[in-house]
């Protein structure tokens, strides 16, 4: 089932401010929280959906990627939480922080940078032969001024509230919960002199230009993984990956079916009746098809090995050419007269002999009406 639009999930406009997003998330989370809806699977699903939407839209970089590429930008992982999406421990920590005034943002510590999704559109020829493309993606890169530490002088201190854990335990009635430490923001460390460039984050926004080699034979839906080309990890953790999803544009001649190609070949009535040799286009140039006499529309001709070389097995698909007998148009008086003379020869048994399908069809129509009127 396709995902709902994140703005629709939170009930806000695409121009919503950060404050409007936060208020909408709070309302959504309070309404669907599992503790308020015990045993309600639909409410739990809505709660997760709300959490996922807010994680993306509350992050400026992720929001820009979502506005540009939609859900495809995050199919291999969201935020710093890894490719599996948010788990219930993180969700409970975040929501209770919001409900009880502890602030947003879960207590988790990211183990790596976020993965990035990018959609690359290719022509069929590029997908079949392979291509190298330069792309530009918005991302978070390690701050060069502080080498990713977030500290102007490189010094950090262990938080004296959470003692480096990044989380604190709170008791609310019968509930014991963990949430991000308010003193260090969940990092477990205090930066006395934040870097002036990244403001203590250790990462800065930048547009990265990359060269992507697309192998021959890719098709719509195939993904190319560029390891380590995702967002820089916080506090020196490894970067995420970049996933390039391929989308192949429709072609004017060929339709692709896996490694096979299909096309239509129009021929004249005279060619269909008398037979002929016609030239057809293939990905490797032209080829010839011998049309036997009395060929009908719909007949398939198979050209082995003229399809697409598989990106996985390296075997080659086939090209299937479907003949379409074209009715002549814009006839000259002489051509019309010749056709009228030709049609006049189709009388009695001669018509049945030369057009068996037409005769069989008319017999069927006559039999149908006889049965209907008897």
Swiss-Prot record:
Keywords linked to the UniProt accession: Chaperone, Cytoplasm, DNA replication, Metal-binding, Repeat, Stress response, Zinc, Zinc-finger
InterPro entries tied to this protein: DnaJ (IPR012724), DnaJ_C (IPR002939), DnaJ_domain (IPR001623), HSP40/DnaJ_pept-bd (IPR008971), HSP_DnaJ_Cys-rich_dom (IPR001305), HSP_DnaJ_Cys-rich_dom_sf (IPR036410), J_dom_sf (IPR036869)
Cofactor binding remark: Binds 2 Zn(2+) ions per monomer.
CXXCXGXG motif repeat residue numbers: 143-150, 159-166, 181-188, 195-202
UniProt entry tagged with the keyword Magnesium: no
GO CC entries: cytoplasm
Domain of life: Bacteria
Domain J: 5-70
PROSITE patterns (UniProt xref): DNAJ_2, ZF_CR
One of the Pfam families matching this protein, by short name: DnaJ_C
Molecular function terms from GO: ATP binding; heat shock protein binding; unfolded protein binding; zinc ion binding
Positions annotated to bind Zn(2+) 2: 159, 162, 181, 184
Main location (coarse class): cytoplasm
GO biological process: chaperone cofactor-dependent protein refolding; DNA replication; protein refolding; response to heat
CDD domains: DnaJ, DnaJ_C, DnaJ_zf
PANTHER family xrefs: CHAPERONE PROTEIN DNAJ, DNAJ HOMOLOG 1, MITOCHONDRIAL-RELATED
Family (UniProt): Belongs to the DnaJ family.
Assembly description: Homodimer.
Entry domain remark: The J domain is necessary and sufficient to stimulate DnaK ATPase activity. Zinc center 1 plays an important role in the autonomous, DnaK-independent chaperone activity of DnaJ. Zinc center 2 is essential for interaction with DnaK and for DnaJ activity.
Protein task: Participates actively in the response to hyperosmotic and heat shock by preventing the aggregation of stress-denatured proteins and by disaggregating proteins, also in an autonomous, DnaK-independent fashion. Unfolded proteins bind initially to DnaJ; upon interaction with the DnaJ-bound protein, DnaK hydrolyzes its bound ATP, resulting in the formation of a stable complex. GrpE releases ADP from DnaK; ATP binding to DnaK triggers the release of the substrate protein, thus completing the reaction cycle.
Protein name per UniProt: Chaperone protein DnaJ
Gene that encodes it: dnaJ
């Amino acid at each position: 089932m396709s995902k709902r639009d994140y703005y629709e999930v939170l009930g806000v406009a695409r121009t919503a401010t950060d404050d409007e997003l936060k208020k909408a998330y709070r309302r959504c989370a309070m309404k669907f929280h599992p503790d308020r809806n015990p045993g309600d699977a639909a409410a739990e699903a809505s709660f997760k959906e709300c959490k996922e939407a807010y994680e993306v839209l509350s992050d400026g970089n992720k929001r820009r990627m979502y506005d540009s590429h939609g859900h495809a930008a995050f199919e291999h992982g969201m935020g710093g939480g890894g490719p599996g999406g948010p788990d219930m421990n993180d969700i409970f920590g975040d929501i209770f922080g919001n409900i009880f005034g502890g602030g947003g943002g879960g207590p988790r510590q990211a183990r790596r940078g976020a993965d990035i999704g990018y959609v690359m559109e290719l022509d069929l020829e590029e997908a079949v032969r392979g291509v190298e493309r330069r792309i530009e993606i918005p991302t978070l890169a390690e701050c060069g001024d502080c080498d990713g530490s977030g500290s102007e002088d490189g010094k950090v201190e262990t938080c004296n509230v959470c003692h480096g854990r990044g989380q604190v335990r709170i008791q609310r009635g019968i509930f014991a919960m963990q949430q991000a430490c308010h003193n260090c923001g969940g990092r477990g460390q205090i930066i006395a002199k934040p870097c002036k460039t990244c403001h203590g984050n250790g990462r800065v926004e930048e547009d990265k230009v990359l060269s992507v080699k697309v192998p021959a034979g890719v098709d719509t839906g195939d993904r190319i993984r560029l390891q380590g080309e995702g967002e820089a990890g916080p506090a020196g953790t490894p970067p995420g990956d970049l996933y390039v999803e391929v989308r192949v544009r429709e072609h004017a001649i060929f339709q692709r079916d896996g490694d096979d190609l299909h096309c239509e070949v129009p021929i004249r009535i005279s060619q269909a009746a008398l037979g002929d040799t016609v030239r057809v286009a293939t990905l490797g140039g032209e080829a010839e098809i011998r049309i036997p006499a009395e060929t009908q529309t719909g007949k398939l001709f198979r050209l082995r090995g003229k399809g697409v070389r598989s990106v996985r097995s390296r075997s080659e698909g086939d090209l299937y050419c479907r003949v379409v007998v074209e009715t002549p148009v814009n006839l000259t008086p002489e051509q019309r007269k010749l056709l009228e003379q030709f049609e006049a020869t189709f009388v009695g048994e001669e018509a049945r002999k030369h057009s068996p399908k037409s005769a069989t069809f008319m017999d069927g129509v006559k039999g149908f009406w006889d049965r209907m009127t008897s």
